[in-house]
Amino acid sequence: MENLQSMPEVQKIISLGKANGEVSYDDINEILPDKILNSEKIDDFFTLLHEMGIEIVEEYTRNTLEPASTLVPKDDSKPARKKKESSASTSGSEDPIKLYLREIGKVSLISGETEVFLAKRIEKGEKIIEETILSSSILRANYIKLLPKIRSKKIKVYDLIRVDKMYALNAEEAHKLEELFFKNILVIQEQEKVLQEAVSKIRKYSETSKKYKEFKEKIDASTEIIHNAIRELGVSQKEIQKISQKIKSMVFRIKEIDRHFLKIKAQYGQDVRDIKAFNRFIEKNEKLDDIEVKMGVNIDEVREVIKDIRNNERKLRRMEQEAGSTVQEIKDWGEKIIKGEREISQAKKELVKANLRLVVSIAKRYANRGMHFFDLIQEGNIGLIKAVDKFEYKKGYKFSTYATWWIRQAITRAISDQARTIRVPVHMIEQVNKVIRETRLFIQEFGRDPNNEEIAERLGWPVQKVKMVKNVAREPISLEIPVGSEEDSELGDFIPDTEVETPVNAAASSILAEQIRQVLHTLPAREQKVIRMRFGLDDGYPQTLEEVGYQFKVTRERIRQIEAKALRRLRHPSRSKKLKDYIDG
């Protein structure tokens, strides 16, 4: 850090930052040399500015602005301006890695306290989702539904409920876990019956009556017992994801039906409830003219609309029965789950963005190992995302310490999976180095690249050996590597698909097929079919004489005779002249 601070370019930026309290990215890119911009020192530089209280901004926002040009002598201002203009004009063709580093450099580093805060936000979001699932009737209905499979050992208990140390469970602990599960499920089943009975009876009484209050107390008590039993069991992460996805799917279908009902209302100018009310008059053939006037369509279409409304209402009722709750409750669950997921997503995004520079610094250690640097960064980013998912702030480690292992593992695994799969022997590496050295010397002497013959002459090797060594020296490159000055294309866009037929060949094949059809059409039906089957003209699979004979219920010799006769007919000039142009050579 001290060596960095002693550099004149760094001192210049620090002076500018102290004068304004902030410094722009443009000034940093203009003043700092490339050896810092494209190295790990850039992280140290940003940390240095952060410690000095100098803010890095896109544009200067303060009135007391002192631009970088005021920190250099006046007679140097014109070249500096020219440099800035030239850099602006070439910004479209800048190295994508440099652009990426610049973008991630704009994200401020976060402290250990902020990491803990973000981890707690993730935990809070997970808690919202878990509480929603635990309080939903879908979970207990699902437990009861899976009970026979659990008893028959088709499903393991620890697949459904939360187990802190599943990997360390012995047979006795697993047995105790099953007993706890069955005990709580029995309580849930009993209280579910009490709850459903109370819910069905409470509807008969008004809210002010004594009976209503009795049943309300019974409902609250049963609900509390059920929730306590479920909370004692907990729910596995796998089951949380499964049920939350099911709830979101239900909410999506409910909203689709709601939108459909709104569309009906907009189209016919009548509320869905009012349209349904027309049905009792239609069944009695009463007020049909009035209904047609109100709806603006004939009575048959009104019947279809009512039928459509009832079908959709049946779908809603089926969902209510499946969930054991009302449509509104399902919507409320969905909103809570989405809120929790949003909280998790935002916190994870901030944690990932703040540590992208860590990925770059680790990826640099694995450069030149058979993978493009950008691919190393992307693989490292995948490892970073996994680290965010697995981070446990309560253990007291800094996130960067925890994430380094995941990032390194992702990069090393990618290198082993995607880099060279064939080991190059040591003697071949020596030969490759000889070719590279002679190529470099030739360029220094003559100012151009040598051809294979010239390298072979200098090394005293056969030309074929030079070609072979060059093939070994080839390094794999990414198909996603940007191509062109605008970086708007990828290398993969320019690789031809050899499996796709060219338009010219496709057109020629189509014309040839048509000519063959016309020629075959002049043969008798039996001969025509034999030729088609023998040469596979219909399905591309030629059949043997025996296979064709089996279909015609004749001997293979008879099929051979029919084929020979058909081919003699096809060789007649009146037929063969149509196909001669297609013979190669």
UniProtKB/Swiss-Prot annotation:
PANTHER family: RNA POLYMERASE SIGMA FACTOR RPO (PTHR30603), RNA POLYMERASE SIGMA FACTOR RPOD (PTHR30603:SF60). Residues 430-506 are annotated as: Sigma-70 factor domain-3. Belongs to the sigma-70 factor family. RpoD/SigA subfamily. Residues 67-93 are annotated as: Disordered. This is RNA polymerase sigma factor RpoD. It comes from Leptospira interrogans serogroup Icterohaemorrhagiae serovar Lai (strain 56601). Sigma factors are initiation factors that promote the attachment of RNA polymerase to specific initiation sites and are then released. This sigma factor is the primary sigma factor during exponential growth. Residues 545-564 bind DNA. Gene3D superfamilies: RNA Polymerase Primary Sigma Factor, Sigma-70 factor, region 1.1, Winged helix-like DNA-binding domain superfamily/Winged helix DNA-binding domain. A motif (Interaction with polymerase core subunit RpoC) lies at residues 375-378. GO terms for cellular component: cytoplasm. CDD domains: Sigma70_r4 (cd06171). It holds the Pfam family Sigma70_r1_1. InterPro entries: RNA_pol_sigma-70_dom (IPR014284), RNA_pol_sigma70 (IPR000943), RNA_pol_sigma70_r1_2 (IPR009042), RNA_pol_sigma70_r2 (IPR007627), RNA_pol_sigma70_r3 (IPR007624), RNA_pol_sigma70_r4 (IPR007630), RNA_pol_sigma_70_r1_1 (IPR007127), RNA_pol_sigma_70_r1_1_sf (IPR042189). Keywords: Cytoplasm, DNA-binding, Sigma factor, Transcription, Transcription regulation. Residues 519-572 are annotated as: Sigma-70 factor domain-4. Interacts transiently with the RNA polymerase catalytic core. Its main location: cytoplasm. Coiled coil: none annotated.
